[in-house]
Amino acid sequence: MKLILFDFDGVLADTEKACYQIHTIKNKDLTWKRFQEYSLGNFFEGYDKAVEEGKHIPADDFLGSYKKILDFLTIHEILHESVLSLATDYRLAIISSANTSYINDFLVKEGLSECFSDVLGADIHRSKTFKIKTILTKYHIMPKDTVFVTDTLGDIKEAEKCCVSSIGVTWGLHDRSILEKGKPLKIIDDPQDLVKVIRKI
Protein backbone atom coordinates (compact mmCIF):
# COMPACT_ATOMS: atom_id res chain seq x y z
CA MET A 1 0.00 0.00 0.00
CA LYS A 2 1.38 3.40 -1.01
CA LEU A 3 -1.53 5.85 -0.84
CA ILE A 4 -4.19 6.27 1.85
CA LEU A 5 -7.12 8.49 0.92
CA PHE A 6 -9.34 9.84 3.68
CA ASP A 7 -12.82 11.22 3.54
CA PHE A 8 -13.12 14.17 5.93
CA ASP A 9 -16.64 14.59 7.33
CA GLY A 10 -17.61 11.61 9.44
CA VAL A 11 -14.14 10.07 9.29
CA LEU A 12 -11.57 12.59 10.54
CA ALA A 13 -14.07 15.21 11.69
CA ASP A 14 -17.20 14.41 13.68
CA THR A 15 -19.40 16.82 11.74
CA GLU A 16 -22.23 14.74 10.31
CA LYS A 17 -24.79 15.31 13.11
CA ALA A 18 -24.04 19.05 13.20
CA CYS A 19 -24.46 19.28 9.41
CA TYR A 20 -27.77 17.47 9.72
CA GLN A 21 -28.93 19.97 12.34
CA ILE A 22 -28.04 22.90 10.06
CA HIS A 23 -30.25 21.43 7.33
CA THR A 24 -33.19 20.79 9.68
CA ILE A 25 -33.51 24.51 10.44
CA LYS A 26 -35.32 24.99 7.12
CA ASN A 27 -36.38 21.36 6.71
CA LYS A 28 -38.25 20.46 9.88
CA ASP A 29 -39.38 17.13 8.43
CA LEU A 30 -35.89 16.05 7.33
CA THR A 31 -35.23 12.72 9.00
CA TRP A 32 -31.78 11.33 9.73
CA LYS A 33 -32.55 8.44 7.37
CA ARG A 34 -33.37 10.77 4.48
CA PHE A 35 -30.24 12.79 5.18
CA GLN A 36 -28.23 9.55 5.03
CA GLU A 37 -29.80 8.71 1.69
CA TYR A 38 -28.18 11.73 0.03
CA SER A 39 -24.86 9.87 0.38
CA LEU A 40 -25.92 6.49 -0.97
CA GLY A 41 -24.36 7.74 -4.21
CA ASN A 42 -22.54 10.98 -4.93
CA PHE A 43 -23.70 13.40 -2.21
CA PHE A 44 -24.23 16.36 -4.51
CA GLU A 45 -26.29 14.34 -6.96
CA GLY A 46 -28.56 13.14 -4.15
CA TYR A 47 -28.79 16.58 -2.56
CA ASP A 48 -29.36 18.47 -5.82
CA LYS A 49 -32.10 16.04 -6.84
CA ALA A 50 -33.93 16.62 -3.56
CA VAL A 51 -33.67 20.39 -4.01
CA GLU A 52 -34.86 20.25 -7.63
CA GLU A 53 -37.85 18.11 -6.63
CA GLY A 54 -38.77 20.57 -3.90
CA LYS A 55 -38.02 18.06 -1.15
CA HIS A 56 -35.18 20.05 0.39
CA ILE A 57 -34.72 23.76 1.04
CA PRO A 58 -31.05 24.85 1.00
CA ALA A 59 -29.77 26.17 4.32
CA ASP A 60 -28.97 29.85 4.72
CA ASP A 61 -25.18 30.30 4.68
CA PHE A 62 -24.42 26.61 5.16
CA LEU A 63 -20.71 27.17 4.58
CA GLY A 64 -20.56 29.86 7.24
CA SER A 65 -22.28 27.61 9.78
CA TYR A 66 -20.06 24.69 8.79
CA LYS A 67 -16.91 26.79 9.22
CA LYS A 68 -17.97 27.68 12.77
CA ILE A 69 -18.35 23.97 13.55
CA LEU A 70 -14.79 23.25 12.41
CA ASP A 71 -13.44 26.22 14.36
CA PHE A 72 -14.59 24.66 17.62
CA LEU A 73 -14.18 20.98 16.72
CA THR A 74 -11.16 18.90 17.71
CA ILE A 75 -10.16 15.63 16.07
CA HIS A 76 -10.46 12.53 18.23
CA GLU A 77 -7.14 11.84 19.96
CA ILE A 78 -6.92 8.29 18.59
CA LEU A 79 -7.49 9.54 15.03
CA HIS A 80 -4.91 12.27 15.55
CA GLU A 81 -2.33 9.68 16.56
CA SER A 82 -3.41 7.38 13.72
CA VAL A 83 -2.77 10.06 11.11
CA LEU A 84 0.65 10.84 12.56
CA SER A 85 1.55 7.14 12.54
CA LEU A 86 0.35 6.44 9.00
CA ALA A 87 2.03 9.56 7.60
CA THR A 88 5.43 8.08 8.43
CA ASP A 89 4.97 5.21 5.96
CA TYR A 90 2.33 6.22 3.42
CA ARG A 91 1.29 9.18 1.31
CA LEU A 92 -1.94 10.57 2.77
CA ALA A 93 -4.53 12.72 0.99
CA ILE A 94 -8.06 13.92 1.71
CA ILE A 95 -10.90 13.54 -0.79
CA SER A 96 -13.93 15.45 0.47
CA SER A 97 -17.23 17.14 -0.32
CA ALA A 98 -16.30 19.96 2.05
CA ASN A 99 -14.47 23.18 1.19
CA THR A 100 -10.72 22.70 0.67
CA SER A 101 -9.63 25.82 2.53
CA TYR A 102 -11.81 24.95 5.54
CA ILE A 103 -10.22 21.51 5.74
CA ASN A 104 -6.73 22.98 5.44
CA ASP A 105 -7.47 25.46 8.23
CA PHE A 106 -8.71 22.61 10.41
CA LEU A 107 -5.58 20.55 9.74
CA VAL A 108 -3.35 23.49 10.65
CA LYS A 109 -5.32 24.02 13.86
CA GLU A 110 -4.94 20.34 14.74
CA GLY A 111 -1.23 20.18 13.86
CA LEU A 112 -1.78 17.72 11.01
CA SER A 113 -1.28 19.82 7.88
CA GLU A 114 2.15 18.33 7.16
CA CYS A 115 0.70 14.82 7.15
CA PHE A 116 -1.36 15.26 3.98
CA SER A 117 0.18 15.88 0.58
CA ASP A 118 -3.13 16.92 -0.97
CA VAL A 119 -6.60 18.06 0.05
CA LEU A 120 -9.24 18.00 -2.69
CA GLY A 121 -12.60 19.43 -1.67
CA ALA A 122 -15.86 20.21 -3.44
CA ASP A 123 -14.44 23.46 -4.82
CA ILE A 124 -11.92 21.38 -6.80
CA HIS A 125 -14.58 19.05 -8.20
CA ARG A 126 -17.87 17.59 -7.01
CA SER A 127 -16.99 14.07 -8.15
CA LYS A 128 -14.83 12.03 -5.81
CA THR A 129 -14.13 9.65 -8.69
CA PHE A 130 -12.56 12.55 -10.58
CA LYS A 131 -10.53 13.63 -7.55
CA ILE A 132 -9.27 10.12 -6.84
CA LYS A 133 -8.14 9.76 -10.46
CA THR A 134 -6.42 13.15 -10.17
CA ILE A 135 -4.34 11.99 -7.20
CA LEU A 136 -3.48 8.64 -8.80
CA THR A 137 -2.32 10.37 -11.97
CA LYS A 138 -0.37 13.07 -10.13
CA TYR A 139 1.73 10.57 -8.19
CA HIS A 140 1.71 7.70 -10.73
CA ILE A 141 0.20 5.35 -8.16
CA MET A 142 -1.78 2.28 -9.17
CA PRO A 143 -5.31 1.74 -7.81
CA LYS A 144 -4.19 -1.56 -6.26
CA ASP A 145 -1.72 0.39 -4.11
CA THR A 146 -4.44 2.71 -2.83
CA VAL A 147 -7.24 2.52 -0.26
CA PHE A 148 -10.01 5.00 0.56
CA VAL A 149 -11.16 5.34 4.18
CA THR A 150 -14.77 6.53 4.27
CA ASP A 151 -18.03 6.49 6.19
CA THR A 152 -20.44 6.38 3.23
CA LEU A 153 -21.64 3.89 0.66
CA GLY A 154 -21.55 6.59 -2.00
CA ASP A 155 -17.81 7.07 -1.51
CA ILE A 156 -17.21 3.34 -1.77
CA LYS A 157 -19.05 3.35 -5.10
CA GLU A 158 -17.09 6.35 -6.40
CA ALA A 159 -13.78 4.75 -5.44
CA GLU A 160 -14.82 1.50 -7.10
CA LYS A 161 -15.17 3.37 -10.40
CA CYS A 162 -11.40 3.97 -10.14
CA CYS A 163 -10.75 0.34 -9.13
CA VAL A 164 -9.75 1.63 -5.67
CA SER A 165 -10.78 -0.47 -2.66
CA SER A 166 -12.27 1.08 0.46
CA ILE A 167 -12.29 0.68 4.21
CA GLY A 168 -15.61 1.59 5.77
CA VAL A 169 -15.83 3.17 9.23
CA THR A 170 -19.01 3.10 11.30
CA TRP A 171 -18.43 6.19 13.45
CA GLY A 172 -19.72 8.48 10.68
CA LEU A 173 -22.85 8.80 8.54
CA HIS A 174 -23.60 5.21 7.50
CA ASP A 175 -23.82 2.18 9.73
CA ARG A 176 -22.39 -1.26 9.04
CA SER A 177 -25.52 -2.56 7.28
CA ILE A 178 -25.34 0.23 4.70
CA LEU A 179 -21.56 0.08 4.23
CA GLU A 180 -21.69 -3.69 3.66
CA LYS A 181 -23.67 -3.10 0.46
CA GLY A 182 -20.52 -1.65 -1.11
CA LYS A 183 -18.39 -4.67 -0.16
CA PRO A 184 -15.43 -2.71 1.25
CA LEU A 185 -12.20 -4.52 2.13
CA LYS A 186 -12.91 -4.04 5.82
CA ILE A 187 -15.40 -2.29 8.07
CA ILE A 188 -14.01 -0.77 11.27
CA ASP A 189 -16.12 0.02 14.32
CA ASP A 190 -13.38 1.40 16.58
CA PRO A 191 -10.92 4.16 15.55
CA GLN A 192 -8.14 2.48 17.50
CA ASP A 193 -8.20 -0.39 14.97
CA LEU A 194 -7.61 1.86 11.95
CA VAL A 195 -3.81 1.75 11.80
CA LYS A 196 -3.68 -1.98 12.46
CA VAL A 197 -6.17 -2.75 9.68
CA ILE A 198 -4.43 -0.52 7.13
CA ARG A 199 -1.00 -1.95 7.86
CA LYS A 200 -2.31 -5.49 7.30
CA ILE A 201 -3.65 -4.74 3.82
Question: What is each of the regions a protein language model found here?
Answer:
Residues T88-Y90, Y139-D145, I201:
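Glycine-rich phosphate-binding loop signature in dinucleotide/nucleotide-binding domains
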Residues L3, T129-E158:
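Conserved Lys-Pro-Asp/Glu-containing loop-to-beta segment of HAD-superfamily phosphomonoesterases
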Residues K2-H80:
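N-terminal helical cap/lid subdomain that shapes the substrate entry/recognition surface
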Residues F35, S113-S127:
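A short, structured active-site edge motif that brings together acidic residues
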Residues F148-I188:
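Acidic, Mg2+-coordinating phosphoryl-transfer loop and its flanking beta/alpha structural elements
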Residues M1-F6, Q192, I201:
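Non-catalytic pre-domain segments flanking phosphatase-related domains
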Residues K67-I94, T100, N104, F130:
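Short, acidic loop-to-helix structural element flanking the phosphoryl-transfer center
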Residues L120-G121, K186-D190:
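Short acidic-hydrophobic, aromatic-tinged amphipathic segments that line or gate anion-handling sites
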